[in-house]
């Protein structure tokens, strides 16, 4: 059984949703990013979604765009992202899913990129701007190297589209709870229970919900119906608000992540 499947199975056995933390690799630099990953992992997160910094992150809101910019300005490269994963693997077996864009995968060479990710310790690949009907090469590379494919379902996705996405996915299905980009919002969408149920009609894979979830109460609401909850901007803000003090960054991340994890209990 894969690390991803084991993580969801453990959460289910504990009567809670899995908590998935998003951080941008290399934000604000390699060493602080590694410490940030350690802080959220030790706070009890079930999966780590690691954003691969990109100069044109179209699906990301301002918070995550700035995180990618900080990482790139610090000199973060694709090789450094793989190195970061290897360093995480020195102290944790938490599942790691790359959150990336197709240009980055293509520029490296699809098979070479997926192989390098697997060798570093990556468990899954979410290529945000790659629809399943255009993903044959990436999917084949993932199958060949034992990396699980994650796809996004949007609020506007019709049933036939959901069915196609469900057929292509192997790790979990990521439902984005609103149209547009990532970022903090005041309340979660009211249609999440219906959307999750609609996806489950097409797959037995775990269904996670992300985009805009930022506090413990919102986590609690989503955890009541979904298999997993993704929080990104609220964690990335812990870095942005404490730049210049790695100690404050890790302390704040540990506190915020721990509070959010507590909201996953059903």
Swiss-Prot record:
This protein's pathway reads: Amino-acid biosynthesis; L-tryptophan biosynthesis; L-tryptophan from chorismate: step 5/5
Top-level lineage group? Bacteria
Q: Which GO terms describe its cellular component?
A: cytosol
Q: Which CDD domains match?
A: Tryptophan_synthase_alpha
Q: What class of enzyme is it?
A: lyase
Among the GO molecular function terms of this UniProt record, one is: tryptophan synthase activity
What InterPro entries does the entry give? Aldolase_TIM, RibuloseP-bd_barrel, Trp_synthase_alpha_AS, Trp_synthase_suA
- What are the entry keywords? Amino-acid biosynthesis, Aromatic amino acid biosynthesis, Lyase, Tryptophan biosynthesis
The keyword Lyase is annotated on this UniProt entry: yes
For this UniProt entry, which segments traverse the membrane? none
Q: Which residues form the active site?
A: 49 (proton acceptor), 60 (proton acceptor)
Catalysed reactions listed for this entry: (1S,2R)-1-C-(indol-3-yl)glycerol 3-phosphate + L-serine = D-glyceraldehyde 3-phosphate + L-tryptophan + H2O
The record's PROSITE patterns line, in alphabetical order, gives:
TRP_SYNTHASE_ALPHA
> Which EC number(s) does the record attach to this protein?
4.2.1.20
The record describes its quaternary structure and partners as:
Tetramer of two alpha and two beta chains.
NCBIfam families for the chain = trpA
Its job: The alpha subunit is responsible for the aldol cleavage of indoleglycerol phosphate to indole and glyceraldehyde 3-phosphate.
Family the UniProt entry places it in: Belongs to the TrpA family.
* Protein name listed in UniProt: Tryptophan synthase alpha chain
- Species of origin reads Opitutus terrae (strain DSM 11246 / JCM 15787 / PB90-1)
The lineage, from the top, is: Bacteria, Pseudomonadati, Verrucomicrobiota, Opitutia, Opitutales
Task: State the encoding gene.
Answer: trpA
């Amino acid at each position: 059984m894969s690390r991803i499947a084991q993580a969801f199975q453990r959460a289910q056995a504990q009567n809670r949703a899995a908590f998935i933390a998003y951080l941008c690799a290399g934000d604000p630099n390699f060493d602080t990013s590694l410490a940030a990953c350690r802080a959220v992992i030790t706070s009890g997160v079930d999966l780590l979604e690691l954003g691969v910094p990109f100069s044109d992150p179209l699906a990301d809101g301002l918070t995550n765009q700035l995180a990618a910019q900080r990482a790139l300005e610090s000199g973060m490269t694709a090789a450094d992202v793989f190195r970061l994963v290897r360093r995480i693997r020195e102290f944790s077996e938490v599942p790691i899913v790359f959150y990336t864009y197709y240009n980055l995968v293509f520029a490296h060479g699809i098979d070479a990129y997926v192989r390098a990710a697997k060798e570093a310790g990556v468990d899954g690949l979410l290529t945000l701007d790659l629809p399943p009907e255009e993903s044959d090469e990436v999917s084949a590379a993932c199958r060949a190297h034992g990396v699980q494919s994650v796809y996004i379902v949007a609020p506007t996705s019709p049933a036939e589209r959901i069915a196609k996405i469900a057929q292509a996915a192997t790790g979990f299905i990521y439902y984005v709870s609103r149209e547009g980009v990532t970022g903090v919002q005041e309340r979660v969408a009211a249609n999440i229970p219906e959307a999750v149920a609609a996806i489950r009609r097409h797959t037995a894979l775990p269904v996670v919900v992300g985009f805009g979830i930022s506090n413990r109460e919102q986590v609690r609401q989503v955890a009541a119906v979904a298999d997993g909850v993704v929080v990104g901007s609220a964690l990335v803000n812990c870095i942005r608000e404490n730049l210049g003090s790695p100690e404050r960054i890790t302390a704040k991340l540990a506190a915020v992540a721990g509070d959010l994890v507590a909201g996953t209990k059903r």
